Curated annotation (Swiss-Prot):
GO terms for molecular function: rRNA binding; structural constituent of ribosome. Gene3D superfamilies: Ribosomal protein L9, C-terminal domain (3.10.430.100), Ribosomal protein L9, N-terminal domain (3.40.5.10). Binds to the 23S rRNA. PANTHER family: 50S RIBOSOMAL PROTEIN L9 (PTHR21368). InterPro entries: Ribosomal_bL9 (IPR000244), Ribosomal_bL9/RNase_H1_N (IPR009027), Ribosomal_bL9_bac/chp (IPR020594), Ribosomal_bL9_C (IPR020069), Ribosomal_bL9_C_sf (IPR036791), Ribosomal_bL9_N (IPR020070), Ribosomal_bL9_N_sf (IPR036935). GO terms for cellular component: ribonucleoprotein complex; ribosome. This is Large ribosomal subunit protein bL9. It comes from the Bacteria. Belongs to the bacterial ribosomal protein bL9 family. GO terms for biological process: translation. Keywords: Ribonucleoprotein, Ribosomal protein, RNA-binding, rRNA-binding. NCBIfam families: L9 (TIGR00158).
Length: 152
């Protein structure tokens, strides 16, 4: 009986690996948990071919997503400055603060493209003025945009 067996994961398994990973596990773990619950399949040449095909498709998809993010970053750079209007009191102090939702709305108004507010990092803004905001477009692509906060 071998000390370790190789299996290909069909789904993410905590502390073991992600979907499509080739991992070595104890035979009992594979036989009693991974294989019966469909979380993994034994390694065969046909399975390895499927895994390689799946990885190639995923790499193509990731490349397309990265290219779209780069194109969107170029569009953001072309626009240059985004404006958020907030109510202010004395000395241009804002009532409240500028949130990442406000910035996402300003980007959406200017580009007609929706962006998740959780991908925007806004410094604490309590006054009108010009600020730099970071937008995460992809795991490898970020953009710095210029944000102008004005009073209305």
């Amino acid at each position: 009986m071998p000390k370790r067996v190789q299996v290909v994961l069909n789904e993410d398994v905590l502390s073991l690996g992600k979907d499509g990973d080739l991992v070595e596990v104890a035979p009992g773990y594979a036989r009693n948990f991974l294989l019966p619950f469909g979380k993994a399949v034994p390694v065969t040449p046909a399975v390895m071919k499927q895994v390689e095909h799946r990885r190639a498709k995923e790499a193509e998809r990731q490349a397309a997503l990265k290219q779209a993010a780069l194109d969107f970053r170029t569009a953001l750079d072309t626009i240059g400055r985004f404006t958020v209007k907030k109510q202010t009191g004395e000395d241009n102090v804002l009532f409240g603060t500028v949130t990442n939702g406000d910035v996402a709305e300003a980007i959406q108004d200017a580009t007609k493209k929706e962006i998740d507010r959780r991908d925007i990092v806004v410094p604490e803004i309590h006054r009108t003025g010009k600020y730099s905001v970071t937008v995460k477009l992809h795991s490898e692509v970020t953009a710095e945009i210029n944000l102008e906060v004005v009073s209305y």
